[in-house]
């Protein structure tokens, strides 16, 4: 579980205090598989316990992992259920986890945002386990293998259409308060990402780096406008790499500029740069990182993502003038 905390020195009028509930590998939830009515009750009780703890800690927003890597945690007509729910790929858990999470969040006065991993599709073993239900089988043209993993290809025009189809399912059918994109970037250390054909076909004279950045921007723009056309009140956020001094490994690097441009172009509601750190020593350097990560754009706050296990289990580690729980 990761948490989101405001970094302003003075508390804003409307403060977001959010936590990521991670389903991949069962890191946060679920720990129980639903193979019986009792399993359903236990799995739901585990989530309720997490939500109760977050409510008691004064959180007001939950980012519930809804899509992992080519599989999902809601009843979808496009991608299969994640095996973490039942122990079987595509296994119906007997209830709709996303609908349940939304209802329980709203009971506690908390917002629920659907957290969707976008570009990565998992390693070869994972993709093979999904079989014919994998997007790599259904939509081969938009998928590429790279370094023993599979990815959606941001440079293919149909990629944004595919991602939008997933988002549309969620926004139209569920009372979500927001859509949150994770891993909306090219893979790390990927100068040879296999998109040369698409680059030649679609670049229109742009450099490779600029073309790749534009591909990601176009995905965000397309989905943001689609969401707002369906439900204008639903927030759209994304999680760029938070290591602002160490982004050379990413072909789409330059997230601070991307965020500022995205906000000014009105294609993103909230930027959530990720730290992904949980060492005690990181607590000392966190205020420095926070103060230099980016300057908030006009009309928006500045937020960052922390590791919730560290924060909730040892809150004194992250106590300081920049963070409050």
Model-derived features: positions:
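Aromatic-lined carbohydrate-binding/catalytic grooves of carbohydrate-active enzymes
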Residues: 57-93
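Active-site-adjacent "subsite" loops/lids of carbohydrate-active enzymes
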Residues: 14-16, 22-45, 103, 114, ...
């Amino acid at each position: 579980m990761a948490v989101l905390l405001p970094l302003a020195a003075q508390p804003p009028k409307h403060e977001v205090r959010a936590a990521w509930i991670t389903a991949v590998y069962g890191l946060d939830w679920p720990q129980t598989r639903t193979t019986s009515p009792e399993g359903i009750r236990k799995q739901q009780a585990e989530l309720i316990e997490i939500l109760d703890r977050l409510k008691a800690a004064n959180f007001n927003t939950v980012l519930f992992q809804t899509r992992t890597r080519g599989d999902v945690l809601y009843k979808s007509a496009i991608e299969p259920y994640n095996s973490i729910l039942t122990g079987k790929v595509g296994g119906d858990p007997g209830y709709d986890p996303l609908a349940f999470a939304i209802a329980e969040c709203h009971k506690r006065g908390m917002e629920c945002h659907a957290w969707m991993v976008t570009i990565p599709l998992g390693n070869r073993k994972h993709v093979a386990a999904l079989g014919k239900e994998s997007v790599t089988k259904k939509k081969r043209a938009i998928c590429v293998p790279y370094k023993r993993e599979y990815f959606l290809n941001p440079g293919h025009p149909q990629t944004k259409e595919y991602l939008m189809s997933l988002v549309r399912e969620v926004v139209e059918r569920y009372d979500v308060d927001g859509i949150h994109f994770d891993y909306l970037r090219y893979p790390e250390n990927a100068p040879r990402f296999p998109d040369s054909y698409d680059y030649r076909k679609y670049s229109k004279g742009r450099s490779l780096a600029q073309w790749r950045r534009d591909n990601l921007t176009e995905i965000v723009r397309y989905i943001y406008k689609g969401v707002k056309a369906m439900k204008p009140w639903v927030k759209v956020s994304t999680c760029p790499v938070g290591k602002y001094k160490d982004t050379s490994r990413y072909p789409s690097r330059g997230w601070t500029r991307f965020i500022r441009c995205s906000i000014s172009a009105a294609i993103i509601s909230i930027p959530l740069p990720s730290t992904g750190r949980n060492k005690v020593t990181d607590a000392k350097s966190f205020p420095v990182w926070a103060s230099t990560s980016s300057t908030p754009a006009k009309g928006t706050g500045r937020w960052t993502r922390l590791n919730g296990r560290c924060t909730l289990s040892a809150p004194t580690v992250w106590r300081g003038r920049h963070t409050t729980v």
